[in-house]
């Protein structure tokens, strides 16, 4: 079953490719090891009219189907760049979960339940591409199928076919994911109750969106509710950043002053018409000074540690060279690949509606219940 789903998602991914090229790739995927090897060699030698991203994606699919196909440096570099920001602990956790997933349904459920980011999904793809023999065929095919489904759903072509209610549902999903961050700041004084209230509201909105899917009447109300929740999420995030300094300040200024100072303060306050007087006792002054010095020292230590980490990354781990390479490829991409992609884009635009395409009318796999799927 997973193999059939992989073929369907591959056809959807290659929807804008020339029909002859698409037929060649699909025939190779369904034709066995030797056919897949031949097609992978054609892709690697750039003998098929595919853009850079399409070529690397198809090579990854074929190698995961048949590990005997040798890895392609271009695809490996793309995967390394996509996962460069991922922590090692996250990578270990993902590998453990992949081996326990079992098949396509297990892999997809893992992605949905954990709400994986793009770099986490790419870590899974990199694992089955670099070490295909460490995983069963079901896990390899399941990982690649889930990845292709994710790419298809994120494409502009896919989003343009989603209804207004579908877009609303996707926005609700983003708000619900953002609200889970409230768990991290729920323990901060003054924000716990607000965070729990916000989570309840977003969950209610998600349920309401599912119930009113396709309803034109409820859409404006849902849009307003989404904007309100998004604004509160952002405001609470900004409040959480300020609380560290605010708590230090209030922990000092809220201490009880001596009776003498309190009387003096009240007297000065009553005798002042246009000036507000705030009195600090001597101990509070010392504590504020120490707090300011402490924050300054912590900031300097943080910067020093960051500098040391960057030096270690540069000289010991050799990451500077890779970063420079990334910057170079971003500013000055490979001219040959860029020119080839531009030429292919123009060719496809020139063909327009004249190109025969038997799958133009076939819908991309998508269901109402699948709105919140990865």
Swiss-Prot record:
Cross-referenced InterPro entries: CM1, CM2
Sites marked Cleavage: 259-260
One MF annotation (Gene Ontology) recorded for this entry: structural constituent of virion
Cystine crosslinks: none
Keywords in alphabetical order: Disulfide bond, Glycoprotein, Host cell membrane, Host endoplasmic reticulum, Host membrane, Ion channel, Ion transport, Lipoprotein, Membrane, Palmitate, Phosphoprotein, Signal-anchor, Transmembrane, Transmembrane helix, Transport, Viral ion channel, Viral matrix protein, Virion
Gene Ontology process terms (BP): monoatomic ion transmembrane transport
The organism's place on the tree of life at top rank: Viruses
Role this protein plays: Ion channel, which might have a role in genome packaging and uncoating processes.
Name of the protein described by the UniProt record: Polyprotein p42
Organism: Influenza C virus (strain C/Taylor/1233/1947)
């Amino acid at each position: 079953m997973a193999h059939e789903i992989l073929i369907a998602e591959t056809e959807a991914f290659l929807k804008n490719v020339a029909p002859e090229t698409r037929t060649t790739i699909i025939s190779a995927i369904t034709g066995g090891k030797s056919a897949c090897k031949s097609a992978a060699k054609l892709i690697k030698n750039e003998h098929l009219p595919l853009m850079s991203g399409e070529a690397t994606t198809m090579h990854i699919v074929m190698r995961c189907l048949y590990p005997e196909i040798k890895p392609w440096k271009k695809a490996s570099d793309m995967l390394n760049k996509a996962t460069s920001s991922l922590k090692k602990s996250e990578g270990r956790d993902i590998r453990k979960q992949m081996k326990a997933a079992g098949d396509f349904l297990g892999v997809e459920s893992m992605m949905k339940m954990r709400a994986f980011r793009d770099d986490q999904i790419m870590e899974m793809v990199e694992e089955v591409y670099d070490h295909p023999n460490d995983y069963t065929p079901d896990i390899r095919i399941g990982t690649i199928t889930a990845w292709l489904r994710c790419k298809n759903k994120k494409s502009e072509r896919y989003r343009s076919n989603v209804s207004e209610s579908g877009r609303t549902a996707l926005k609700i999903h983003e708000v619900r994911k953002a609200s889970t961050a409230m768990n991290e700041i729920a323990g901060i004084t003054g924000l716990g109750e607000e965070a729990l209230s916000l989570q309840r509201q977003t969950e209610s909105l998600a349920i309401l969106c599912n119930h009113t899917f396709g309803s034109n009447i409820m859409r404006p109300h849902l849009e307003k509710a989404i904007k309100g929740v998004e604004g509160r999420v952002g405001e609470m995030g900004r409040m959480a950043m300020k609380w560290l300094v605010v708590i230090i300040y209030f922990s000092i200024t809220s201490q009880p002053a001596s009776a003498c100072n309190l009387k003096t303060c009240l007297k000065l306050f009553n005798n002042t018409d246009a000036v507000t007087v705030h009195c600090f006792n001597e101990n509070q002054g010392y504590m504020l000074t120490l707090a300011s010095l402490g924050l300054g020292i912590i900031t300097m230590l943080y910067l020093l540690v960051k500098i040391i980490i960057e030096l270690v990354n540069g000289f010991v781990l050799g990451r500077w060279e890779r970063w420079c390479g990334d910057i170079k490829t971003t500013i000055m991409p490979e001219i040959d690949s860029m020119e080839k992609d531009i030429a292919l884009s123009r060719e496809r635009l020139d063909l327009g509606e004249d190109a025969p395409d038997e799958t133009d009318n076939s819908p991309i796999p998508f269901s109402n219940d699948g709105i919140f799927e990865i």
